Protein backbone atom coordinates (compact mmCIF):
# COMPACT_ATOMS: atom_id res chain seq x y z
CA UNK A 1 0.00 0.00 0.00
CA UNK A 2 1.28 3.42 -0.93
CA UNK A 3 1.77 6.22 1.55
CA UNK A 4 -1.11 8.29 0.19
CA UNK A 5 -3.47 5.35 0.45
CA UNK A 6 -2.47 4.79 4.04
CA UNK A 7 -3.06 8.43 4.89
CA UNK A 8 -6.48 8.29 3.27
CA UNK A 9 -7.42 5.24 5.35
CA UNK A 10 -6.21 6.97 8.52
CA UNK A 11 -8.30 10.04 7.82
CA UNK A 12 -11.35 7.89 7.13
CA UNK A 13 -10.82 5.95 10.34
CA UNK A 14 -10.36 9.14 12.33
CA UNK A 15 -13.49 10.61 10.89
CA UNK A 16 -15.44 7.44 11.59
CA UNK A 17 -14.15 7.32 15.17
CA UNK A 18 -14.87 11.00 15.78
CA UNK A 19 -18.55 10.89 14.77
CA UNK A 20 -19.77 8.63 17.57
CA UNK A 21 -18.04 10.83 20.15
CA UNK A 22 -19.85 13.90 18.86
CA UNK A 23 -23.14 12.04 18.88
CA UNK A 24 -22.50 10.92 22.44
CA UNK A 25 -21.71 14.46 23.49
CA UNK A 26 -24.87 15.77 21.83
CA UNK A 27 -26.92 13.01 23.46
CA UNK A 28 -25.44 13.82 26.87
CA UNK A 29 -26.18 17.50 26.35
CA UNK A 30 -29.77 16.65 25.34
CA UNK A 31 -30.22 14.52 28.44
CA UNK A 32 -28.86 17.29 30.65
CA UNK A 33 -31.23 19.78 29.05
CA UNK A 34 -34.16 17.38 29.56
CA UNK A 35 -33.25 16.97 33.22
CA UNK A 36 -33.00 20.73 33.67
CA UNK A 37 -36.40 21.18 32.01
CA UNK A 38 -37.93 18.53 34.25
CA UNK A 39 -36.43 20.15 37.34
CA UNK A 40 -37.63 23.58 36.33
CA UNK A 41 -41.10 22.24 35.52
CA UNK A 42 -41.24 20.40 38.84
CA UNK A 43 -40.17 23.56 40.65
CA UNK A 44 -42.82 25.54 38.81
CA UNK A 45 -45.51 22.98 39.63
CA UNK A 46 -44.42 22.85 43.26
CA UNK A 47 -44.52 26.63 43.45
CA UNK A 48 -47.97 26.62 41.83
CA UNK A 49 -49.15 23.97 44.27
CA UNK A 50 -47.83 25.99 47.18
CA UNK A 51 -49.54 29.10 45.86
CA UNK A 52 -52.83 27.24 45.37
CA UNK A 53 -52.58 25.72 48.84
CA UNK A 54 -51.82 29.07 50.40
CA UNK A 55 -54.66 30.66 48.45
CA UNK A 56 -57.08 27.92 49.47
CA UNK A 57 -55.96 28.12 53.08
CA UNK A 58 -56.34 31.88 53.06
CA UNK A 59 -59.77 31.59 51.46
CA UNK A 60 -60.83 29.00 53.99
CA UNK A 61 -59.50 31.17 56.78
CA UNK A 62 -61.49 34.09 55.43
CA UNK A 63 -64.66 32.01 55.08
CA UNK A 64 -64.39 30.38 58.51
CA UNK A 65 -62.35 32.43 60.96
CA UNK A 66 -60.89 30.71 63.94
CA UNK A 67 -62.99 31.51 67.01
CA UNK A 68 -61.25 33.56 69.65
CA UNK A 69 -62.96 32.46 72.84
CA UNK A 70 -60.71 34.41 75.17
CA UNK A 71 -62.40 37.70 74.33
CA UNK A 72 -65.85 36.24 74.88
CA UNK A 73 -64.91 34.68 78.21
CA UNK A 74 -63.51 38.00 79.33
CA UNK A 75 -66.68 39.81 78.30
CA UNK A 76 -69.26 37.47 79.79
CA UNK A 77 -67.39 36.73 82.99
CA UNK A 78 -67.92 40.33 84.10
CA UNK A 79 -71.68 40.38 83.48
CA UNK A 80 -74.20 40.14 86.28
CA UNK A 81 -76.92 38.02 84.71
CA UNK A 82 -79.17 38.34 87.76
CA UNK A 83 -79.37 42.10 87.22
CA UNK A 84 -79.67 41.79 83.48
CA UNK A 85 -82.59 39.39 83.83
CA UNK A 86 -84.50 42.01 85.83
CA UNK A 87 -83.61 44.92 83.59
CA UNK A 88 -86.35 47.35 82.66
CA UNK A 89 -87.05 47.72 79.00
CA UNK A 90 -89.35 50.57 77.95
CA UNK A 91 -90.34 51.02 81.59
CA UNK A 92 -91.58 47.45 82.09
CA UNK A 93 -89.88 44.40 83.52
CA UNK A 94 -89.29 41.79 80.86
CA UNK A 95 -87.26 38.59 81.27
CA UNK A 96 -84.33 38.02 78.98
CA UNK A 97 -83.31 34.50 78.05
CA UNK A 98 -79.83 33.86 76.73
CA UNK A 99 -79.05 31.72 73.72
CA UNK A 100 -75.85 29.70 74.28
CA UNK A 101 -75.03 29.52 70.57
CA UNK A 102 -74.69 33.28 70.46
CA UNK A 103 -71.57 33.08 72.57
CA UNK A 104 -69.63 31.69 69.60
CA UNK A 105 -68.31 33.90 66.80
CA UNK A 106 -69.60 31.76 63.94
CA UNK A 107 -73.14 31.76 65.27
CA UNK A 108 -72.79 35.37 66.26
CA UNK A 109 -72.80 36.51 62.66
CA UNK A 110 -76.16 34.81 62.14
CA UNK A 111 -77.81 36.53 65.07
CA UNK A 112 -76.20 39.92 64.80
CA UNK A 113 -79.30 41.48 63.29
CA UNK A 114 -81.36 40.32 66.27
CA UNK A 115 -79.12 42.29 68.56
CA UNK A 116 -79.64 45.48 66.64
CA UNK A 117 -83.42 45.06 66.59
CA UNK A 118 -84.28 43.68 70.04
CA UNK A 119 -81.82 45.28 72.39
CA UNK A 120 -81.29 48.84 73.57
CA UNK A 121 -77.81 49.75 74.70
CA UNK A 122 -78.98 52.60 76.91
CA UNK A 123 -80.64 50.06 79.22
CA UNK A 124 -77.26 48.50 79.93
CA UNK A 125 -75.67 51.87 80.50
CA UNK A 126 -78.17 52.47 83.28
CA UNK A 127 -76.90 49.29 84.93
CA UNK A 128 -73.28 50.35 84.61
CA UNK A 129 -72.43 47.63 82.10
CA UNK A 130 -71.03 48.00 78.61
CA UNK A 131 -72.61 45.06 76.90
CA UNK A 132 -71.17 44.09 73.51
CA UNK A 133 -73.09 42.87 70.53
CA UNK A 134 -72.67 39.13 71.24
CA UNK A 135 -75.32 39.51 73.94
CA UNK A 136 -78.63 38.47 72.38
CA UNK A 137 -81.66 38.66 74.67
CA UNK A 138 -84.57 36.59 73.44
CA UNK A 139 -87.59 38.32 74.90
CA UNK A 140 -90.42 35.97 75.73
CA UNK A 141 -94.01 36.91 76.35
CA UNK A 142 -94.74 35.83 79.92
CA UNK A 143 -97.51 38.35 80.51
CA UNK A 144 -100.22 35.70 81.15
CA UNK A 145 -98.18 33.98 83.86
CA UNK A 146 -97.22 37.29 85.41
CA UNK A 147 -100.86 38.37 85.41
CA UNK A 148 -101.93 35.21 87.21
CA UNK A 149 -99.21 35.73 89.78
CA UNK A 150 -100.28 39.32 90.34
CA UNK A 151 -103.90 38.26 90.80
CA UNK A 152 -102.86 35.63 93.32
CA UNK A 153 -100.83 38.15 95.26
CA UNK A 154 -103.72 40.60 95.22
CA UNK A 155 -105.94 38.07 96.96
CA UNK A 156 -103.59 38.13 99.97
CA UNK A 157 -103.24 41.88 100.21
CA UNK A 158 -104.03 43.39 103.59
CA UNK A 159 -107.43 45.03 103.54
CA UNK A 160 -106.15 47.94 105.60
CA UNK A 161 -103.74 48.84 102.81
CA UNK A 162 -106.17 48.35 99.96
CA UNK A 163 -109.15 49.85 101.71
CA UNK A 164 -112.56 48.20 101.97
CA UNK A 165 -112.62 45.30 99.46
CA UNK A 166 -116.14 44.23 100.48
CA UNK A 167 -117.80 45.88 97.54
CA UNK A 168 -120.80 43.50 97.35
CA UNK A 169 -123.56 45.00 99.51
CA UNK A 170 -126.90 43.49 100.51
CA UNK A 171 -129.76 45.79 99.53
CA UNK A 172 -131.86 44.59 102.51
CA UNK A 173 -129.55 44.86 105.52
CA UNK A 174 -126.59 46.74 103.98
CA UNK A 175 -124.19 43.97 104.97
CA UNK A 176 -121.14 43.84 102.69
CA UNK A 177 -119.21 40.87 101.34
CA UNK A 178 -115.98 40.41 99.42
CA UNK A 179 -117.40 37.81 97.03
CA UNK A 180 -120.52 37.83 94.94
CA UNK A 181 -121.47 34.20 95.66
CA UNK A 182 -121.37 34.93 99.39
CA UNK A 183 -123.85 37.74 98.84
CA UNK A 184 -126.13 35.41 96.89
CA UNK A 185 -126.10 32.88 99.72
CA UNK A 186 -126.78 35.65 102.24
CA UNK A 187 -129.83 36.91 100.36
CA UNK A 188 -131.44 33.50 100.76
CA UNK A 189 -131.82 34.33 104.45
CA UNK A 190 -134.12 37.21 103.53
CA UNK A 191 -135.98 35.36 100.82
CA UNK A 192 -136.21 32.01 102.59
CA UNK A 193 -134.96 30.22 99.51
CA UNK A 194 -133.48 26.75 100.10
CA UNK A 195 -132.63 25.26 96.74
CA UNK A 196 -130.65 22.26 98.00
CA UNK A 197 -133.13 19.55 99.00
CA UNK A 198 -132.46 16.09 100.41
CA UNK A 199 -133.78 13.30 98.19
CA UNK A 200 -134.41 11.01 101.17
CA UNK A 201 -136.44 13.17 103.54
CA UNK A 202 -137.15 16.31 101.54
CA UNK A 203 -135.34 18.64 103.92
CA UNK A 204 -133.91 21.71 102.17
CA UNK A 205 -130.83 23.82 102.79
CA UNK A 206 -129.46 27.13 101.62
CA UNK A 207 -125.92 25.84 101.03
CA UNK A 208 -124.74 22.63 99.35
CA UNK A 209 -122.29 21.86 102.15
CA UNK A 210 -125.13 21.62 104.65
CA UNK A 211 -126.93 19.14 102.39
CA UNK A 212 -123.78 17.01 102.14
CA UNK A 213 -123.50 16.81 105.92
CA UNK A 214 -127.21 16.06 106.24
CA UNK A 215 -126.99 13.09 103.90
CA UNK A 216 -124.71 11.35 106.39
CA UNK A 217 -127.70 10.99 108.72
CA UNK A 218 -129.33 8.67 106.21
CA UNK A 219 -126.34 6.34 106.06
CA UNK A 220 -124.66 4.07 108.58
CA UNK A 221 -121.33 5.82 108.09
CA UNK A 222 -120.28 7.56 111.29
CA UNK A 223 -116.68 8.67 110.89
CA UNK A 224 -116.50 10.76 114.09
CA UNK A 225 -115.78 8.38 116.98
CA UNK A 226 -115.39 9.30 120.63
CA UNK A 227 -112.06 8.24 122.06
CA UNK A 228 -113.49 7.60 125.54
CA UNK A 229 -116.62 5.58 124.98
CA UNK A 230 -116.29 4.60 121.30
CA UNK A 231 -119.58 6.21 120.45
CA UNK A 232 -119.74 7.33 116.81
CA UNK A 233 -121.39 10.27 115.14
CA UNK A 234 -121.98 11.34 111.58
CA UNK A 235 -121.12 14.98 112.22
CA UNK A 236 -118.15 16.59 113.95
CA UNK A 237 -120.39 19.06 115.78
CA UNK A 238 -122.32 16.19 117.35
CA UNK A 239 -119.06 14.65 118.56
CA UNK A 240 -118.00 17.94 120.12
CA UNK A 241 -121.33 18.15 121.93
CA UNK A 242 -120.90 14.58 123.16
CA UNK A 243 -117.39 15.25 124.47
CA UNK A 244 -118.81 17.80 126.90
CA UNK A 245 -120.54 14.99 128.73
CA UNK A 246 -117.16 13.53 129.60
CA UNK A 247 -115.60 16.82 130.62
CA UNK A 248 -118.66 18.26 132.41
CA UNK A 249 -118.26 21.52 130.51
UniProtKB/Swiss-Prot annotation:
Tissue specificity remark: In larva and adult, expressed in the M3 pharyngeal motor neurons, extrapharyngeal neurons in the head, the PQR tail neurons, rectal cells, vulva cells, the spermetheca-uterine valve, body wall muscle cells and neurons of the ventral nerve cord. In the embryo, expressed in pharyngeal cells, extrapharyngeal head neurons and within the tail. Expressed in body wall muscle cells during late embryonic stages. Expressed in the mother cells of the M2 and M3 pharyngeal motor neurons precursor cells at the embryonic bean stage and subsequently in the M2 and M3 cells as they are born.
Could you tell me which InterPro entries the record lists for this protein?
Znf_C2H2_sf, Znf_C2H2_type
User: Compositionally biased, Acidic residues: which spans?
Assistant: 24-52
Main location per UniProt? nucleus
Question: What segment(s) does the record annotate as region Disordered?
Answer: 20-65
UniProt note: phenotype after gene disruption: RNAi-mediated knockdown results in defective formation of the distal end of the two M2 pharyngeal motor neurons.
What's an example of a GO molecular-function annotation for this chain? RNA polymerase II cis-regulatory region sequence-specific DNA binding
- List each coiled-coil range: none
Task performed by this protein: Required in the M3 pharyngeal motor neuron to guide the growth cone of the sister M2 motor neuron during axon development.
Cellular component (GO) terms are: nucleus
A Gene Ontology annotation in the biological process aspect, one of them, is:
nervous system development
Which intervals hold the zinc fingers (C2H2-type)? 168-190, 196-218, 224-246
Where it sits in the cell: the answer is:
Nucleus
Q: What is the official name of this protein in its record?
A: Zinc finger protein mnm-2
Q: Which Gene3D superfamilies does this entry report, sorted A to Z?
A: Classic Zinc Finger (3.30.160.60)
A Pfam family (short name) is zf-C2H2
The taxonomy runs: Eukaryota, Metazoa, Ecdysozoa, Nematoda, Chromadorea
**UniProt keyword list:** Metal-binding, Neurogenesis, Nucleus, Repeat, Zinc, Zinc-finger
Amino acid sequence: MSVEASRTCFLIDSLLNKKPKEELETEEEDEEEDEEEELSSSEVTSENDMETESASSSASSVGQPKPDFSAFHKIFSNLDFAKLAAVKRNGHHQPMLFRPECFFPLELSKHLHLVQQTFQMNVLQNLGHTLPLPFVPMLKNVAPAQKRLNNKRASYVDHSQKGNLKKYRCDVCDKTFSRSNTLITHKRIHTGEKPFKCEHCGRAFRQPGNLTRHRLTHTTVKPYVCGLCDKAFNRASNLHTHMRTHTNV
